[in-house]
C-alpha cells in the first residue's frame, strides 16, 4: 500500500467486553445506543458491512459487503483515549495509568501552586461542563485555577480566558506535565479554557499535554523508515508530538473531515492518522444519543466521496479507541467496549475476521502493508484482507 488513512471515531465502541464488570460498564454498547435514536442513519457503512460485525445484530446485514471486518478486544488495562490509541499504535499497557477518585495529593498540588503562583479550586472528579458552572464565579473572583479529574487518567485545568489567557493556561499545563511523572504520570494534562458569563461555556481551544508513549509505536517506525506520518486532530497531542512528519489540529468533526478529504487529494506515502473527537467530547460524555447519531450520519454521508478519491494503492481503516455509551447512566465516563475494524479500498477483500484479541493488530497490519519493520504484540491481518 502507498497510503493508509486510519480514522478513529473517538469512543464509537460496539458492545461491552467480557471484563466490563471490572470497569463498571456491564451492558454498555455505544453503537447500539445510537442505532436506537431516530436520528440514526449509517446507510453507507451498513451497505459496506457494519451490521456484519460480530455482536452488531441490531443492524441489517449487507447484501454484498465491501469491507474487511473485525471486532477487536482491548488487551490493555484501561478504557481511555491514551491507552486505546497507544494500543492501536502497537503498545499493550499491562497497568492502567493512575487515576484520582479522591483528587490529587498535596505532593502534586503544592509544587503546582508554588510554580504557577495561583491557588487551586475543586480538586476532585467532576463533569467539565458542571465544574465551570459550580466554580467559575469563584475563579473569576480569586484567580484560582479550577483543577479537576475524571474516571480517566487526566489532570484538567479550567480557566476563564479573561483571567488566564490561553497561552498562559498552556504554560500552566506544561508546569503540571513536568510535575506529573513517575507514580503520578497521568495520561494527559488538559487545558480547558472557558468564556462568557455564568453558566459559562467551554471554548474549542482545549489543548492536551500527553505523557510520551513508553515504547516505540508504529508511528515512530513509519517515520524511521522515511515515510510520511500525518496526524489530524488530537493525534499530535495523544502521542506527545512524537512519531509524525506533519500535523494539523481540527476544531471538530466537520473540520476534521474536511482536512482528511484534503489529504486524500495530496501526494504522500505512509499513514494519515485521524481522530474525530466530537463523538466522545460533545455527545458521549454528555449522554446525548441523538447528537451522537447525527455525528455518525455526518461521517457516513462523507465517506463515499472520500472513498472515490482513493487510488489503487490506498486503504482506509475505520476504528475506535474505547466506548462512551450516550445512554449509560451509571456514570458519564468511557465504557469498556469492543471496537470495530472496517477496512475499505480497491484492493481490500470483503472478509469477516470475526473477533480478534488486540487493538494492536491494527499496528501490525499497517506496518506490514507499508512494508515498515515494527515489532508489536499484535498479529497482522494484512494477508487476509488484500
Over which residues does each language-model region extend?
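Feature captures the catalytic ectodomains and active-site-proximal regions of enzymes
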Residues: 1-386
Amino acid at each position: 500500500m502507498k497510503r493508509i488513512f486510519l480514522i478513529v471515531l473517538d469512543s464509537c465502541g460496539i458492545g461491552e467486553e467480557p471484563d466490563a464488570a471490572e470497569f463498571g460498564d456491564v451492558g454498555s454498547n455505544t453503537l447500539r445506543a445510537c442505532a436506537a435514536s431516530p436520528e440514526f442513519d449509517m446507510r453507507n457503512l451498513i451497505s459496506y458491512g457494519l451490521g456484519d460485525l460480530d455482536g452488531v445484530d441490531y443492524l441489517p446485514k449487507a447484501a454484498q459487503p465491501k469491507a474487511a471486518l473485525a471486532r477487536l478486544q482491548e488487551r490493555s488495562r484501561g478504557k481511555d483515549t491514551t491507552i486505546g490509541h497507544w494500543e492501536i499504535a502497537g503498545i499493550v499497557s499491562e497497568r492502567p495509568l493512575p487515576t484520582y477518585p479522591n483528587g490529587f495529593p498535596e505532593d502534586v498540588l503544592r509544587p503546582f501552586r508554588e510554580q504557577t503562583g495561583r491557588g487551586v479550586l475543586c480538586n476532585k472528579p467532576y463533569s467539565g461542563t458542571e465544574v465551570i458552572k459550580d466554580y467559575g464565579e469563584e475563579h473569576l473572583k480569586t484567580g484560582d485555577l479550577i483543577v479537576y479529574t475524571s474516571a480517566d487518567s487526566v489532570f484538567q485545568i479550567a480557566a476563564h480566558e479573561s483571567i488566564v489567557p490561553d497561552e498562559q493556561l498552556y504554560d500552566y499545563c506544561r508546569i503540571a506535565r513536568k510535575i506529573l511523572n513517575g507514580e503520578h504520570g497521568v495520561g494527559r494534562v488538559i487545558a480547558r479554557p472557558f468564556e462568557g458569563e455564568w453558566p459559562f461555556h467551554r471554548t474549542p481551544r482545549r489543548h492536551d499535554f500527553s505523557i510520551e508513549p513508553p515504547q516505540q509505536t508504529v508511528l515512530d517506525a513509519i517515520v524511521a523508515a522515511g515515510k510520511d506520518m500525518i496526524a489530524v486532530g488530537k493525534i499530535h497531542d495523544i502521542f506527545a508530538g512524537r512519531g509524525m512528519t506533519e500535523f494539523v489540529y481540527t476544531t471538530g468533526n466537520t473540520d476534521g473531515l474536511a482536512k482528511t478529504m484534503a489529504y486524500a487529494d495530496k501526494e504522500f506515502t505512509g499513514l494519515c492518522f485521524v481522530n474525530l473527537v466530537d463523538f466522545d467530547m460533545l455527545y458521549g460524555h454528555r449522554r446525548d444519543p441523538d447528537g451522537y447519531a447525527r455525528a455518525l450520519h455526518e461521517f457516513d454521508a462523507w465517506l463515499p466521496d472520500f472513498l472515490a478519491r482513493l487510488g489503487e494503492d490506498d486503504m482506509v481503516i475505520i476504528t475506535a479507541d474505547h466506548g462512551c455509551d450516550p445512554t449509560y447512566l451509571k456514570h458519564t465516563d468511557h465504557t469498556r467496549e469492543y471496537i470495530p475494524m472496517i477496512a475499505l479500498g480497491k484492493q481490500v477483500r470483503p472478509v469477516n475476521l470475526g473477533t480478534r484479541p488486540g487493538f494492536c493488530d491494527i499496528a501490525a497490519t499497517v506496518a506490514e502493508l507499508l512494508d515498515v519493520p515494527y515489532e508489536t504484540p499484535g498479529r497482522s491481518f494484512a494477508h487476509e484482507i488484500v
